[in-house]
C-alpha cells in the first residue's frame, strides 16, 4: 500500500466537528457511546484560564453542552501518560467547578462526561472501550448507596447520586 493521506479521528474532532453543521456526526458518536439520544446545543470554550499561578492549565480537544445542560469533554491523547487517570479526574473536576457560580446550590452541578480516546494502553484489559462511573458501595453489606426521598425530590426524581 502506497503513501496515503488519511484523516485521523483527532484531526476530525478538533477541526470538523466544531461546526454546527457537523453536530449530527458528533451527536451520533456520543449517542452510541453513551447509549442515549444526545442533542448538542453548543460547543463551549475548551481552554480554562488559570485563576492562580499555581493552577494547572486545562485544555481539552472539544467541550460540548447537550440539550439537558450536561457537559461532555472529549480528549484525544497521542502520547503515553502513565498518570492519565489523574489527568481525567483533574480535567473533569476543573470543568465542574467552572460551570457553577459562587452561591449557587450544589444541586445545580452539571453532569460531566469525560470521553477519552487514547492511542496507547491505558491499563491492562481485554476490551478496547471502557465505561467508568462513580458508585458508592457499602463496605459491610456491598449494597449500592441510593438517595433518600428528600434528596431525590431535591434532584428532580433521581435515585442515584450521579
Residue ranges with predicted function:
Residues 1-162:
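Elongated, amphipathic alpha-helical interaction scaffolds
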